[in-house]
Structure formats: structure tokens, C-alpha cells
Amino acid sequence: MTNESAEFNLLTNQGVMLSQDNLTWTCMRAHEVYDWKYDYENVVSYLPLSHVAGTFIDIYLIMYGGGAVYFADKMALQGTLLKTLVEAKPTLFFGVPRVYEKIQEKMKEAAKANTGLKKTLSDMAKEASLEHHFATFEGKPGGGLKYKLGKKVVMSKVAKALGFERTRGFYSSAAPLSEDVFR
């Protein structure tokens, strides 16, 4: 039979039914969109498994295409997520907007300590990186010397400090990202 129930997620005032057809179709499409590398990908699980995004990513997406899941401790959303990210070095990162907001807050806090040449290089790298990524979103060539220099000198160090040196894709679910956080 088609469209049989695979799982029910019970939330505070509601329930969500995930069907077998829905999960299978979504996994197939996600693997195409994310250019999934079989038995190579790893993700960090920090959302409760009662959260539909947490269940889909941490269980079904990994089972469908192979890979590893690093389970963060229960205090991940209270500040220990960074430790797990640095240890796991995820290849794909799936976050809810609040997690991206917290990462942005920490980055802004760290940037305040930069002065002189370090601040100039950091600002240049951020600007060049934004230009590069917005150009590639529009199908235009990105890069250039400023971007390559900024990536090598600044952005690679930031990525390593956050555990994202192997991360090739960042994805958001559950709610829209604000434009400020997206940048």
C-alpha cells in the first residue's frame, strides 16, 4: 500500500504524520539537491527527535544515503554545540534560524576584538565572501583575488574555529532566516 504512516511526531498541541511516500520522495530529492556523497557525509544532531527536521535529517536522510551522525549532548542549544561541531567537522550543517542567530552573535562578539590590520582584513574578507556567494547564487562567476585571499587568510580560520572546515553546505529549516543572518 502506498502512503502508509511511517511515523507520528507528537508536539505540545498538535501531531505530525510522516508518510512512507513522503519520506522516500523527500530523501531522494534531498540527496539530489545536497549532492549527497554516499557513506561520506556527516551531520551533527542537536535538535530533539520530536522535531520533524531533526527526525528527517538525523535518522531518515542518513539511513537513506549513508553517513554518520554525531549526537550532541543535551545542553547543545545552551552552549555546548560548538564543542561538538569542532569535534565532528560536519560536511553538511542543518540549522534552525535560532542556531544561526547564536552563531552570528558569537561571530560579531569575536569581531569586536579585532583592531588595525586584523579588522581591515576581516572586513575585506567578509565583504569579498558576500560578493562571491551572491554572484554564484545569481549564476555569475564569483571569486577573484580579494575573495581567494580573504578565504585563505581569514575565512578558513573562522571555519576551523567553528568546526566548519569540511562543511560544503549550510541549510535552514523550520522557519525562514532573517536577511541579516543569511548574510
Where in the sequence are the language-model features?
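Conserved AMP-binding A3 loop
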Residues: M1-C27
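Short, conserved loop/helix-junction motifs that constitute active-site signature segments
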Residues: A161-E165
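Structured core elements
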Residues: T2, M17, V44-S45, Y70-F71, ...
